[in-house]
Amino acid sequence: MKDKVLLGHGSGGALMADLLKNVIFAAFPDVQPTDGAVADVPAGMRLVFTTDSFVVKPLFFPGGDIGRLAINGTVNDLAMMGAEPALISCGLIIEEGFALDDLRRICASMSRAAMEAGARIVTGDTKVVGYGEADSIFINTSGIGYAQPVYGFSPDRVKAGDVIIVNGGLGEHGMAVMAGRLGVSFAPELPSDSAPLWPQVKALLGAGIVPGVMRDITRGGLGSVAAELAEGLPLDYHLWEACLPVDARVVKACDIWGFDPLYVASEGRFLLSVGPAQVEEALRLLGPAAASIGKVSAGSGRVFLHTTVGGVRPVRPLPGEMLPRIC
């Protein structure tokens, strides 16, 4: 059992000390063996704090794994608040019998993702539960970032006439996880879109483009996100189906498995609203995969999809769970 996680690895004794030294601290060199981490808030900045938990299945999927997802998910929540990611905590709940090699692989992936995002994993916790009391491994990450006080992105800052933009192809993470779960593959491979969003947000803000709202397109996909943003406001969101950037492999997978691409999750995509004069520059900064997908008008909190065949259909929040455990 030397290659497996044992209950003793969570006991606080010699086995746990060995696990921390040879697996956790080896992957996260900024973690100190103390009860927490201490940091200063840069002068003139606001502290932004967020937390998220990850239970994705399978743990490893095309283009990513639960470790990369756990870092990017929290980093992206900070980015949507206009905050540069700085400090991350990592909480691991591990099932007895979990392979140590897989744990090392996950921790190494988290370390790489944090470095890519410019953040540091500085504190954490590890618990081991009995066999059958969890499903392999669950991860919680909390993050602290720093934002300029002038930024305050909110649905009520969106204005009639604003243009809706997404930064890349929709639904790729959800379909990559589904493919991994079913053991099928695409040619060429369809990887998860999991990625840190801060570099793109930083580029926008640095160019003086301050969106009315930003929201990462995760569970519930674009449809649910747009419906949530519009709800209760004197605005309507109009989405143009012909403009939605959806990879042909995502379309094919959705056709086969009975999903609507409008509601499939991404993990490296976000929606933003900008004024008409800033659209061209925003698209340039976001890169060639970005697309202008709709507009905002005066209305009553509704979302409409203008279809490729000339119809218009309402877009409502996803009523239930279409694809469970995708993050």
Stretch-by-stretch model annotation:
Residues 33-34, 264-269:
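Short Gly/Ser/Thr- and Asp/Glu-enriched loop/turn motifs at secondary-structure junctions
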Residues 140-153, 185-206:
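Active-site glycine-rich loop that binds ribose-phosphate moieties when present
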Residues 273-279:
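Helix N-cap motif at beta-to-alpha junctions
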